[in-house]
Amino acid sequence: MSDDVQERLKGLVETHDVLLFMKGSPLFPQCGFSSRAVAILNHLRVDFESFDVLQDQGVRQGIKAFSDWPTIPQLYVKGEFVGGSDIMMEMYESGELAQMLADKGVVAAH
């Protein structure tokens, strides 16, 4: 991954409180995993930004090295990598995701 891509990714994850790197957009996800990630965030009423990795091959490959995680989608909260779709689902089902988002001041505690 080039330094330019690394700096761009760092800037993106630090600029947005909640950022989802995904395939497609929240309105038109291009894979089931991205769709599930969006559904989880929407259900928790999280205000989030998304980045469509299908529109930028450098970011699509770079984000995998940046996070040391091989798949998309990838969720970042307050600059910290949380995980992909499966981890999001596990955390959502256990209540851990809602608690983490509340602890970081992103959503109100339920």
Residue ranges and their predicted role:
Residues 4, 58, 83:
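Short, conserved clusters of charged catalytic residues that mark active-site
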Residues 77-108:
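Non-catalytic, surface beta->alpha helical segment in thiol-disulfide oxidoreductase systems
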Residues 10-47:
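Local sequence-structure signature of Cys/Sec-based thiol-disulfide redox active-site neighborhoods
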Residues 21, 74-78:
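Acidic beta-strand-to-loop metal/phosphate-binding motif
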Residues 65-71:
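Thiol/disulfide oxidoreductase modules built on the thioredoxin-like
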Residues 7, 60-65:
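TIR-domain catalytic/interaction hotspot
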Residues 1-10:
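Flexible, polar/low-complexity N-terminal or interdomain linker segments that lie immediately upstream
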Residues 45-60:
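Thiol-based oxidoreductase modules, predominantly thioredoxin-like and allied folds used
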